[in-house]
């Protein structure tokens, strides 16, 4: 009986160990194996681990406009308020660690403190057929608002601009997913990731899905003088779209041995991905004020119209023995627009404003230089 118990215990331990090994083998295969590759077009280096050093210059901005009717003494005056977050660029350096398709990056701000970008975090799972890219950053920058009042189409009879003494904070979370149709001959991440090399020029149609969430927080002082309609702003967008991407191979030389050194590959990528924002949720928060402090808040939740937006990028990748150098520029544009009735009874401006229309956009561009070592 003791021998049987010992045998069963040993069998259970070995089975659990085998299942654990089988799980990690599947994970390793998912991260490192590229299936259905046309080797005349795509080459996969043997090294799976990567260590990279990057430098990024980035600018992110927010611009919006609210149009409304202003009632006074029985007359309705047309009004426009505009809000803008400064676009001073931020420079940062960071590290990227990768294994196969998986890449994790983290960067911190350096240089002049014109734009206080506290952090950048990126998590990527990038394959030739499909991939996911998740990025988050926060940035503080100058915040300004303007107001114009006019009678109909006449020139404004009143205009004022306010520049907040303290910066406003923008937080930005973005998750992109893609699928490449011609993934047998086209390696989409070849110009910004070290795991794939494009041997011959090729391109493909792609589909993409994007989730974006952005928050803009104005300081109380800025809010008090920003004409009251929008002190905090949030937008959540889900977009679907597609486009075309192409890798132009400017130079390629296959490795001929372990000791063979030198330039291996130079590839230029161009990508254009127009998208349609199907879900466009907007939330604005307006505080109530008195002479000494602000208290309470009115929140407006609105679903905006479907809107066309755009994601574009270009990148240059250079393979030099075990080193990979990438220069990439990315630009994306997220537009929002909503017409809704402004409930003046619930606002601190007391029955003087209605028919508020809100529109604007978040825009973000970045230029990234990456040096990677494969091992």
Language model features: what each stretch is:
Residues 56-69, 73-74, 135-173:
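Outer-membrane beta-barrel translocator/channel fold
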Residues 45-51, 91, 100-102, 128-132, ...:
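Outer-envelope beta-barrel architecture signal
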Residues 66, 70-75, 215-322, 331-334:
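Outer-membrane beta-barrel transmembrane domain signature
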Residues 78-81, 107, 118, 158-166, ...:
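Extracellular loop and loop/strand-boundary signature of outer-membrane beta-barrel proteins
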Residues 51-59, 97, 106-110, 125, ...:
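Transmembrane beta-barrel strands of outer-membrane/channel proteins
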Residues 175-177, 361-375:
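Outer-membrane beta-barrel "beta-signal"
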Residues 20-27, 31-48, 182-203, 250-268:
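Short loop/turn motifs that connect adjacent beta-strands in outer-membrane beta-barrel proteins
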Residues 101-107, 129-134, 183-187, 252-254, ...:
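Repeated loop/turn-to-beta-strand initiation elements of outer-membrane beta-barrel proteins
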């Amino acid at each position: 009986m003791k021998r049987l118990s010992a045998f069963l215990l040993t069998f259970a331990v070995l089975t659990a160990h085998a299942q654990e090994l089988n799980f990690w083998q599947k994970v390793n295969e998912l991260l490192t194996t590229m299936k259905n590759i046309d080797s005349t077009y795509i080459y996969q280096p043997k090294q799976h681990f990567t260590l990279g050093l990057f430098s990024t210059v980035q600018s992110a901005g927010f611009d919006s406009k609210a149009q409304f009717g202003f009632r006074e003494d029985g007359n309705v005056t047309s009004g426009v308020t505009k809000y803008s977050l400064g676009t001073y660029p931020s420079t940062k350096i960071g590290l990227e660690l990768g294994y196969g398709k998986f890449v994790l990056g983290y960067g911190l701000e350096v240089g002049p403190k014109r734009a206080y970008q506290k952090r950048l975090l990126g998590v990527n799972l990038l394959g030739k057929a499909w991939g996911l890219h998740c990025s988050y950053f926060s940035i503080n920058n100058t915040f300004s608002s303007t107001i114009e009042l006019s009678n109909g189409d006449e020139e404004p009879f009143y205009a004022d601009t306010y520049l907040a003494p303290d910066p406003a904070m923008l937080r930005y979370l973005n998750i992109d997913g893609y699928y490449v149709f011609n993934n047998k001959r086209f390696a989409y991440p070849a110009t910004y990731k070290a795991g794939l090399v494009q041997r011959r020029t090729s391109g493909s149609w792609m589909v993409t899905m994007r989730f974006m969430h952005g928050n803009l927080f104005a300081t109380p002082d800025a809010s008090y003088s920003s004409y009251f309609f929008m002190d905090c702003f949030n937008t959540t967008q889900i977009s679907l779209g597609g486009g075309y991407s192409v890798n132009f191979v400017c130079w390629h030389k296959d490795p001929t041995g372990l000791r063979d050194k030198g330039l291996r590959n130079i590839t230029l990528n161009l990508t254009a991905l127009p998208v349609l924002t199907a879900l466009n949720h907007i939330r604005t928060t307006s505080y109530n004020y008195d002479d000494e402090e602000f208290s309470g808040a009115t929140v407006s939740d609105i679903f905006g119209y479907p809107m066309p937006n755009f994601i574009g990028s270009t990148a240059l990748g250079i393979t030099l023995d075990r080193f990979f150098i990438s220069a990439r520029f990315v630009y994306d544009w997220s537009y929002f627009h909503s017409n809704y009735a402004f409930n003046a009874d619930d606002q601190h401006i007391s029955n003087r404003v209605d028919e508020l229309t809100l529109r604007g956009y978040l825009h973000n561009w970045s230029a990234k230089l990456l040096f990677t070592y494969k091992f």
